[in-house]
Amino acid sequence: MSNTATDFVRFALDEGVLRFGSFKVKSGRMSPYFFNAGLFNSGRSVGKLAAFYAQALLDSGLNFDMLFGPAYKGIPLATATAVALAGHPQASGDIPFAYNRKEAKDHGEGGTLVGAPLAGRVVIIDDVITAGTSVRESVEIIRAAGAQPAAVLIAMDRMERAGPDEALSPHSAVQDVAKTYGIPVISIASLADILQLLQDDEQFAAHRDSVLAYREQYGV
């Protein structure tokens, strides 16, 4: 587990974004942990989150030209990460960003895109990948503008097999996205990093077995 991933998992716990217990998740499964990036909802926490996104992106060594935030959750993520990159000593230059509207605007500048023109190698930023719908829409928008999707950058990779229990895919939603679009998915942290923390920190030992069992059943 990298220092960035370790620090991010602890940060998510401190902010109440990552919790342990019993939670019904979007898939309908009962999960022993829950990651809710919507709880990064203050200037300080979003600023720190953006610094983690920026570091994970730079650590990946990816060649990219700009950021794209899919509406709605990706909008503040792309904006804040562009700010974090602008002040990062490893970043080269001022990174532009753009985002889309869900509804086209029929006055002013019009259209569904806001921000810098989509061009070059574009990184899509989101919190997690569940079904891959926002990624698909983003890829279509970027390609339609004549630009190239370069990667998807997310906060947490749940490393979880997609599909209903009776027809589980052998792959996770993240793996499906990478294969379908031929682009890497970069995550700040993953379920493997959460499990490493549970192994290393005795204060979370009570949750270790349930998370391990969940990964055994649904993990990739």
UniProtKB/Swiss-Prot annotation:
Database matches in PROSITE patterns: PUR_PYR_PR_TRANSFER (PS00103)
Keywords: Glycosyltransferase, Magnesium, Pyrimidine biosynthesis, Transferase
Residues where 5-phospho-alpha-D-ribose 1-diphosphate binds: 26, 72-73, 101-102, 105, 107, 126-134
Record-level Gene Ontology MF annotations: magnesium ion binding; orotate phosphoribosyltransferase activity
Pfam family, one: Pribosyltran
GO biological process, one term: pyrimidine ribonucleoside biosynthetic process
Binding-site positions, orotate: F34, F35, T130, R158
UniProt pathway annotation: Pyrimidine metabolism; UMP biosynthesis via de novo pathway; UMP from orotate: step 1/2
GO CC annotations, alphabetized: cytoplasm
Cofactor list: Mg(2+)
Record's keyword annotation contains Zinc: no
Catalytic activity: orotidine 5'-phosphate + diphosphate = orotate + 5-phospho-alpha-D-ribose 1-diphosphate
Alphabetized InterPro entries for the sequence: OPRT, Or_phspho_trans_dom, PRibTrfase_dom, PRTase-like
Protein origin, superkingdom: Bacteria
EC number: 2.4.2.10
Family: Belongs to the purine/pyrimidine phosphoribosyltransferase family. PyrE subfamily.
Subunit description: Homodimer.
Function: Catalyzes the transfer of a ribosyl phosphate group from 5-phosphoribose 1-diphosphate to orotate, leading to the formation of orotidine monophosphate (OMP).
Protein name per its UniProtKB record: Orotate phosphoribosyltransferase
Originating species: Bordetella avium (strain 197N)
